[in-house]
């Protein structure tokens, strides 16, 4: 069991280090696994079996806020998430805010996921001279070719601050959703900050130090397993009747 937990931790750390420069990435955590003993009549057997955790746990603390000055860079100030439509998958939550406008006007993030509005519909922004995004996520533009000073609301970035009892997990596709695979309803409770990009919440120094510690523990555990095997084989030899 311990060796399996260490293996899973190493996999998560490799994933975290690979994504340390991805805006809004949430650090993967290793799930705690439980142990179940076999029930027998009037007692318990000493043999135990590992029970796998649900998987997909992640750290929710915010990453570093970088004031980029780019008009399509947005970040969530504290708690909350944007809504996205991944290229291959169901609606999900994200903290990634490096936005760009496609030729057809669709607003996407740096991963190519479509940004959704408060109705969970794709946001399409017409050509503009300037753009301003409010704390509520409202997208105000000066239309290209419009009258001087004319502004229109081109859309609203859908956001949510989930209730305390909502459990979020990363799915097999790496996207954040509720444990049942759905997403909470938009409530526009998050604070949106324009000209700012949130980095990942991965601490590379911490990950590397933990990786070294895990590797040492793995080697110790492996030596213990080999020693136990040798002792078992030695005991079997001693108990073998003479020929």
Locate the predicted segments by residue.
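Amphipathic alpha-helical polymerization modules
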Residues: 1-243
């Amino acid at each position: 069991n311990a060796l399996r937990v260490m293996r899973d931790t190493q996999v998560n750390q490799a994933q975290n280090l690979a994504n340390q420069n991805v805006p809004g990435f949430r650090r993967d955590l290793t799930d705690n696994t439980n142990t179940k003993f076999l029930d027998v009549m009037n007692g318990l057997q000493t043999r135990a079996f590992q029970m796998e955790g649900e998987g997909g746990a992640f750290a929710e603390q915010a990453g570093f806020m970088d004031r980029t000055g780019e008009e399509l860079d947005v970040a969530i100030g504290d708690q909350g998430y944007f809504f996205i439509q991944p290229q291959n998958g169901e609606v999900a939550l994200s903290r990634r805010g490096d936005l760009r406008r496609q030729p057809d006007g669709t607003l996407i993030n740096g991963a190519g996921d479509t940004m959704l509005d408060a109705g969970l519909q794709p946001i399409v922004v017409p050509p503009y001279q300037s753009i301003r995004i409010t704390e509520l996520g409202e997208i105000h533009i000066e239309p290209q070719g419009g009258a001087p000073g004319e502004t229109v609301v081109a859309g609203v970035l859908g956001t949510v601050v989930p209730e305390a009892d909502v459990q979020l997990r990363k799915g097999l596709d790496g996207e954040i959703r509720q444990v049942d695979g759905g997403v909470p309803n938009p409530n526009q409770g998050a604070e949106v900050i324009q000209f700012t990009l949130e980095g990942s919440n991965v601490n590379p120094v911490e990950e590397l130090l933990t990786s070294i510690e895990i590797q040492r523990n793995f080697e110790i555990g492996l030596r213990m397993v080999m020693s136990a095997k040798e002792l078992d084989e030695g005991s079997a030899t001693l108990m073998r009747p003479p020929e």
